[in-house]
């Protein structure tokens, strides 16, 4: 496949078609041209289409660089559809029970947990570095949801917002494609109410019983999820008295707990889950806190380096169009960097070391004292109790 030198430059669509034809040609085993030859031709066509790496102003799309196009050509990945690898329809018998607001997860009588039953099958190899990605906010926007389900690699996990409509259908579609799914748990952030986790969020101002009622409502939103992912929650998740009852409840349901809030710090929730021997993970890097091509690519590179250093790394992303595009591009080249993409469930219990019973009890006492001091510091000083100090001359 060659680029005719006299081709008109008036049609962007025609030039993009040339890009795609060249990329596909590189994956054709009968094509005599080398990948380098095709990369040079792609560079010429890319120059006609637009500035490499420049982001669109509206939809967050970018013009791929020649290097990216050549890499995609070698993989045969450009515009190749993801083939479904369906997971079993949910709910499965014996893995739910009636709650206050509908069916909620539970472990089966034979010991099978919802985590065991609903995670995506994956075999880890000892010594191989792995990265996992959770894309959040699924269900809130139908176009982005469709793109995430259909265009992302199946080993990328999807977290559904409890506030989305038609959640059972979204969950069914995601699992039918082959993605494992998680439920987002909205929790109070430090800057609440400036950052608003929504009307059913878990709040430090509520009594434990009310938060557990809200938790039941959240857990009943749809079936088939392998675990929960904290959303916001930088304040709620840092208070032992607030997060501990939630983790204990999640542990009883047999679900995985993923800390999706603290950008790499070992959260109290993940530590409590680890101490209970529940499956858990911690999001190390927020991939698209700044949703630009270059920033996303930089964060993904950081994630790969962290995986090479620590053995595993977990990224948290949102379902922006540019994020989905960059994730697909990045994942097609990941194996060449010596790192494999895994579902987040496959990395359970690999990041947080369980505390001994003595360590856990000491941490609990320290947390209780810290909360008590914080409450005293926040309380107004009492100057109206009728007592007065004796002033000595």
Where are these regions (language model features)?
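Juxtamembrane proline-rich low-complexity "stalk" or linker regions positioned immediately after a signal peptide
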Residues: 2-106
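C-terminal domain-boundary segment and adjacent tail
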Residues: 250-265, 269, 319-392
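A short, acidic, amphipathic alpha-helical segment used as a generic capping/interface helix at domain edges
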Residues: 295-309
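Glycine-rich anion/phosphate-binding loops
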Residues: 163-168, 205-213
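Catalytic domains of cell-wall/extracellular-matrix polysaccharide-remodeling enzymes
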Residues: 208-297, 318-335, 339
């Amino acid at each position: 496949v060659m680029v005719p030198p006299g081709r008109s430059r008036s049609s962007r669509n025609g030039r993009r078609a040339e890009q795609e034809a060249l990329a596909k040609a590189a994956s054709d085993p009968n094509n005599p041209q080398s990948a380098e030859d095709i990369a040079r031709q792609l560079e010429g066509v890319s120059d006609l289409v637009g500035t490499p790496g420049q982001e669109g102003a509206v939809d967050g799309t970018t013009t791929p660089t020649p290097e990216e196009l050549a890499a995609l050509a070698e993989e045969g990945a450009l515009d190749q559809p993801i083939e479904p690898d369906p997971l079993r329809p949910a709910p499965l018998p014996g893995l739910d029970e009636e709650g206050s607001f509908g069916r909620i997860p539970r472990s089966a009588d034979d010991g099978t947990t919802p985590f065991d039953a609903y995670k995506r099958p994956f075999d880890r190899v000892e010594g191989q570095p792995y990265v996992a990605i959770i894309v959040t906010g699924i269900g809130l926007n139908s176009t982005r949801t469709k793109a995430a389900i259909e265009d992302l690699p199946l080993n990328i996990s999807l977290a559904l917002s409890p506030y989305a409509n038609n959640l059972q259908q979204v969950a069914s579609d995601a699992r039918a494609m082959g993605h494992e799914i998680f439920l987002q748990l909205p929790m109070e952030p430090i800057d609440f109410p400036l950052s608003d986790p929504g009307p059913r969020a878990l709040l430090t101002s509520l009594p434990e019983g009310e938060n557990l009622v809200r938790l039941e409502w959240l857990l009943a939103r749809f079936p088939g999820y392998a675990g929960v992912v904290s959303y916001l929650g930088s304040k709620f998740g840092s208070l032992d008295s607030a997060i501990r009852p939630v983790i204990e409840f999640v542990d009883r349901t047999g679900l995985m707990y993923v800390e999706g809030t603290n950008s790499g710090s070992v959260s109290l929730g993940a530590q409590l889950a680890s101490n209970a021997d529940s499956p858990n993970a911690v999001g190390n890097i927020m991939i698209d806190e700044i949703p630009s091509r270059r920033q996303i690519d930089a964060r993904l590179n950081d994630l790969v380096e962290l995986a090479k250093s620590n053995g595993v790394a977990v990224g948290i992303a949102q379902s922006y169009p540019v994020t989905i595009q960059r994730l697909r591009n990045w994942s097609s080249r990941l194996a060449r960097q010596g790192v494999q993409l895994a579902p987040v469930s496959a990395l359970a219990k690999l990041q947080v070391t369980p505390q001994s019973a003595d360590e856990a009890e000491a941490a609990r006492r320290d947390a209780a004292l810290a909360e008590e001091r914080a409450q005293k510091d926040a309380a107004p000083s009492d100057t109206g109790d009728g007592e007065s100090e004796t002033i000595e001359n």
